Amino acid sequence: MSRLANSAGDWADDEEFDEAASLPPQQVISNKDGTKTVITYRFNDDGKKVKTTRRIRTTVVKEHVNPRVAERKAWAKFGLEKDHAPGPSLDTTSVGENIIFRPSVNWKAQAKEVEKAGGEKGGLKDQLKDKKVKCRICSGEHFTARCPFKDTMAPVDEPTGPTGGDNEDEERPAGALGSGATAYVPPALRKGGSGGEKMAGRYERDELATLRVTNVSELAEEGELRDMFGRFGHVTRVFLAKDKETNMAKGFAFISFADRADAARACEKMDGFGYRHLILRVEFAKKTT
């Protein structure tokens, strides 16, 4: 009896169960509104038959491109990209943003000078081939920012002690200890105690190209002012004074340009310009002391 049972079990194992044959075929129905209904069947993890209905709408998007661009896209690929599908491949091509190149006014003359210098002295790569990194503090072969003596020594080209003469006491930096090349000078007191010149110079350039705009409407916005003055040059900063409680403009603003010439042109054109039923008064901001 057990022998018959084993044979029956083997017979059941040998028979293959075809899931695809037991499922109804896929159905595609075209609707009057232009859509298609796709009906498919499958078995889930529990072995139950599941019916899936999807409605698909096909949309055709037409894009008008330059004929020359379309012609270049149809060119056959070569090299490692040979026999690949048209268009950029994601594994070999990275599509970036479109950068607008704006050459300077005298870019042709500059290009000729660079080309001439390159022909006489060789390319830039050849000039820098044998150059090594040199620290400005200890003259070592490392970057100045990584110098271990940057907090205790002054750069080689900077005077660290008195140089002699009648005004020796006046020229000696305050806080300097000892004399000679090994004297310690705090970073803030180097170059005769003028540690803040670079920061002041940056703000001074900013003030020279800053316009003060008065008689501004209470409904004015910084974005509108930036668009209005941005026609004359690159605007680096727009400050519109507003009331903290009402968030309304107080009537004046400051516009900073990257170039003073652009600021002068904007001052000439925008002084007396009508904006939101008011006449703007534009002038250069006074230098702070």
UniProtKB/Swiss-Prot annotation:
One of its GO terms (cellular component) is eukaryotic translation initiation factor 3 complex. It is found in: Cytoplasm. One of its GO terms (biological process) is formation of cytoplasmic translation initiation complex. Transmembrane segments: none annotated. Residues 1-31, 151-199 are annotated as: Disordered. GO terms for molecular function: RNA binding; translation initiation factor activity. Keywords: Cytoplasm, Initiation factor, Protein biosynthesis, RNA-binding. Its main location: cytoplasm. Residues 209-287 form the RRM domain. RNA-binding component of the eukaryotic translation initiation factor 3 (eIF-3) complex, which is involved in protein synthesis of a specialized repertoire of mRNAs and, together with other initiation factors, stimulates binding of mRNA and methionyl-tRNAi to the 40S ribosome. The eIF-3 complex specifically targets and initiates translation of a subset of mRNAs involved in cell proliferation. This subunit can bind 18S rRNA. This is Eukaryotic translation initiation factor 3 subunit G. It comes from Coccidioides immitis (strain RS) (Valley fever fungus). The gene is TIF35.
